[in-house]
Swiss-Prot record:
Described purpose of this protein according to its UniProt entry: One of the primary rRNA binding proteins, it binds directly near the 3'-end of the 23S rRNA, where it nucleates assembly of the 50S subunit.
Organism classification: Bacteria, Bacillati, Actinomycetota, Actinomycetes, Micrococcales
Name this protein carries in UniProt: Large ribosomal subunit protein uL3
Organism encoding this protein: Pseudarthrobacter chlorophenolicus (strain ATCC 700700 / DSM 12829 / CIP 107037 / JCM 12360 / KCTC 9906 / NCIMB 13794 / A6) (Arthrobacter chlorophenolicus)
GO cellular component, one term: cytosolic large ribosomal subunit
Region (Disordered): 137-158
Gene that produces this protein: rplC
Assigned keywords, A-Z: Ribonucleoprotein, Ribosomal protein, RNA-binding, rRNA-binding
Gene Ontology molecular function, alphabetical: rRNA binding; structural constituent of ribosome
């Protein structure tokens, strides 16, 4: 499917959270994302690939650790090898150039964005932590049932457990997109984005910041 709208995007590293004062003397919690060394490594076009997109590389890596096919790919783009690569479908892909560097100035303060990342892994979790179940009563004869899920299906009807039943299991460590966050400030000198609120992932996690797909 061909992209019909212009989308900007950058890969960056989540440095953590802090708080800053705004112009109304309100304390705003922000997430700091460092998005330096983004570069265009490939251009997709409708004639050859069937769709238009740009491929963005991010993060330094020892050239000795790069496979020969990837080394040739980066050499063709005229850039040093990058650790992370992501593809962004955008209608204005033809306006980019191979090897072009992208900066945080793609975004502006007040702009709505989406942030994609991998959530923190929580390990094996019960239904109360994983799905917000209330559990069983704390007294009145409840015996070692306080954090159990309760019934997961009748014996004769439906005599099975439905697919998708919320149960205990591995929690977190999944790809997650947070929509319609706001850019609080842009520090071009330090390649920093200050984003209002929280974004998925732990400190040091690589995240993808793009213009909001749903506007808001």
């Amino acid at each position: 499917m061909t992209a019909t709208r212009n989308v900007k995007g950058l890969l960056g590293t989540k440095l953590g959270m802090t708080q800053v004062w705004d112009e109304n003397n309100k304390l705003i919690p922000v997430t700091v994302v460092q998005a330096d060394s983004n570069v265009i490594t490939q251009l997709r076009n409708a004639e050859v690939d069937g769709y238009v997109a740009v491929q963005i590389g991010y993060g330094q890596i020892d050239p000795r650790k790069v496979t020969k096919p990837l080394a040739g790919h980066f050499e063709k783009a005229g850039v040093t090898p990058r650790r992370h690569v992501v593809e962004l479908r955008t209608a204005d892909a033809a306006e980019y150039e191979l090897g072009q560097e992208l900066s945080v100035e793609l975004f502006a303060a007040g702009q709505k964005i989406d942030v994609i990342g991998t959530t923190k892994g929580k390990g094996f979790a019960g239904v109360m932590k994983r799905h917000g179940f209330h559990g069983v009563g704390a007294s009145h004869g409840a015996h070692k049932n306080h954090r159990k899920p309760g019934s997961i299906g009748g014996a004769s009807t439906p005599s099975r457990v439905f697919k998708g039943m919320k149960m205990a299991g591995r929690m977190g460590a999944v790809r997650h997109t947070t929509l319609n966050l706001t850019v609080h400030a842009v520090d071009a000198e330090k390649s920093l984005l200050l984003i209002k609120g929280a974004v998925p992932g732990a400190r040091g996690q690589v995240v993808f910041v793009r213009t909001a797909v749903k506007g808001a």
